[in-house]
Amino acid sequence: MTNPHDIIIKPVVTENSMMEMAEKKYTFVVAKKANKIEIKKAVEKIFDVKVEKVNTMNMIGKMKRMGKHIGRRSNWKKAVVTLTDGSKGIEFFEGM
C-alpha cells in the first residue's frame, strides 16, 4: 500500500468524533490491512501534520434484515489519530 489515499478511505463524522476533535483526535475509516505505521505516514503526507499516536479498532459489520432475508454489512477498520500539540488541525474537519 504505497499510495496514502488507498490507506485513508474516509473520515468518520459522528457526534463522538466531533467532540474528540477539540483534543486533536481525528477518526478515519482505513484499509483493513493497514497497520499503525502506514496510517501515521499516510495522515502526515496527506494533511501535512505531525501525528503523536494512532489507535486502531476492527469494527464488526452489523446484521441487517430486509423482510425475511438476513444479510450483513462489511467489517471495517477504524483509526483514531492523535496530533501533536504543536501541530495545526486538519482543515478538512474545521467547517463541520
Curated annotation (Swiss-Prot):
Keyword Ribosomal protein present in the record's keywords: the answer is yes
Pfam families with a match to the protein in the record: Ribosomal_L23
Q: Which GO terms describe its molecular function?
A: rRNA binding; structural constituent of ribosome
Keyword tags: Ribonucleoprotein, Ribosomal protein, RNA-binding, rRNA-binding
Q: Give a GO biological-process term.
A: translation
Q: Name one GO cellular component term.
A: ribosome
Top-level taxonomic group:
Bacteria
Q: Which PANTHER family match?
A: 60S RIBOSOMAL PROTEIN L23A (PTHR11620)
| Function in brief | One of the early assembly proteins it binds 23S rRNA. One of the proteins that surrounds the polypeptide exit tunnel on the outside of the ribosome. Forms the main docking site for trigger factor binding to the ribosome.
Q: How does it assemble?
A: Part of the 50S ribosomal subunit. Contacts protein L29, and trigger factor when it is bound to the ribosome.
Family assignment? Belongs to the universal ribosomal protein uL23 family.
What is the recorded name of this protein?
A: Large ribosomal subunit protein uL23
